[in-house]
């Protein structure tokens, strides 16, 4: 028995060194605690009601008040000494706040909960790995699409793919022509140059891959030749464009002239049937008189309208009107005026 008591004392000392002590238990006995509880109950029953309102409430609410719940629950081991029975320390769970110590006996406190469950490190790593795998797959697809787009589905040769990617980075098409010449190819201006370059490239590829340096130099020479030929062909191409721009105007002019001729056809017929004529008198009072040969048919007399008076005269009278003598053949003295402005109308 003595050995057991000594061992229990040693355990108590070791526990007292490790865990904090509840020092109030030394001065307060179990009987005193019971008396304090009775006094608290008596104090609760006493009401000091003066008929005043506190915040709109009259009297005292006798209902049990809500117990404040703590957001954090902590298990704290305390070693309590009992004066009546010196026994080993026991592990008890208490709450941090003093208010919750009183409410723990009446009801259990609310445990704090989180809105989202905490992820473990394994799940986080798995998710990151999946994201990296998806990104790698997307990059691989992108590179495959670029290769197939450049090589046209036949990109088995890595050198061709490399040259194609280099030309694409430089901003030039795969045919070796500049960007502006590629746009000209669409309009059909440089098809001959591109065909010649393609044939030369095919012949260079058929020679073999052992002459990489020579092929690169030949390609550069071809590019320079193509650029010079294109620069020379530019003025020649601009000339047809200018011709095409001038052609519509010429066509319009022709059409307008045709329309004018078509409109003036009846007037031309009238002029051919009624030409302008003039005559000059041989006498001292001779003068030039203009007239219009009026239309006449077979078996009718020839009449000329005088421009100065508007009278219809016979050829002999027209010659006399100009101051000439009487002649046997007056028509020989009358001249048709082809250069008069009336004929040009």
From Swiss-Prot:
Q: Which family does it belong to?
A: Belongs to the Ninja family.
Q: What is this protein called?
A: Ninja-family protein AFP1
Domain of life of the source: Eukaryota
State its role.
Acts as a negative regulator of abscisic acid (ABA) response during germination through the ubiquitin-mediated proteolysis of ABI5/DPBF1.
Q: What happens when the gene is disrupted?
A: Exhibits slight hypersensitivity to abscisic acid (ABA), salt and osmotic stress.
Q: Which InterPro entries match?
A: Ninja_fam, Ninja_motif, NLS_NINJA_AFP-like, TDBD
Q: What is the lineage of its organism?
A: Eukaryota, Viridiplantae, Streptophyta, Embryophyta, Tracheophyta
Presence of keyword Cell membrane:
no
Compartments where found: Nucleus
| Gene field | AFP1
């Amino acid at each position: 028995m003595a050995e057991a008591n000594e061992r229990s004392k040693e355990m108590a000392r070791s526990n007292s060194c490790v865990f904090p002590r509840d020092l109030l238990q030394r001065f307060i006995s179990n009987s005193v605690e019971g008396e304090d509880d009775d006094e608290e109950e008596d104090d609760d029953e006493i009401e000091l009601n003066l008929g005043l309102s506190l915040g709109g409430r009259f009297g005292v609410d006798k209902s049990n008040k809500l117990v404040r719940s703590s957001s954090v629950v902590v298990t704290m081991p305390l070693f309590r000494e009992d004066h009546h029975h010196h026994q080993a320390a026991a592990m008890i769970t208490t709450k941090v706040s003093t208010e919750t110590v009183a409410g723990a006996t009446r009801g259990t406190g609310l445990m704090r909960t989180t809105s989202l469950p905490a992820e473990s490190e394994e799940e986080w790593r798995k998710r990151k790995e999946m994201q990296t795998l998806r990104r790698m797959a997307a990059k691989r697809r992108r590179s495959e699409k670029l290769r197939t787009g450049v090589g046209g589905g036949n990109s088995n040769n890595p050198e061709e793919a490399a040259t194609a990617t280099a030309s694409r980075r430089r901003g030039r098409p795969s045919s070796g022509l500049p960007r502006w010449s590629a746009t000209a190819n669409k309009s059909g201006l440089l098809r001959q140059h591109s065909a010649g370059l393609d044939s030369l490239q095919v012949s260079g590829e058929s020679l073999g891959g052992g002459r990489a340096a020579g092929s690169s130099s030949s390609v550069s020479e071809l590019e320079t030749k193509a650029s010079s030929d294109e620069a020379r062909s530019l003025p020649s191409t601009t000339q047809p464009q200018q011709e095409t721009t001038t052609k519509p105007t010429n066509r319009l002019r022709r059409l307008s002239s045709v329309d004018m001729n078509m409109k003036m056809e009846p007037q031309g017929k009238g002029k051919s049937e009624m030409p302008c004529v003039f005559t000059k008198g041989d006498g001292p009072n001779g003068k030039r008189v203009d007239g219009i040969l009026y239309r006449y048919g077979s078996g009718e007399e020839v009449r000329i309208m005088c421009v100065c008076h508007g009278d219809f005269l016979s050829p002999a009278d027209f010659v006399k009107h100009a101051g000439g003598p009487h002649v046997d053949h007056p028509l020989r003295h009358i001249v048709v005026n082809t250069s008069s402005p009336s004929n040009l109308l």
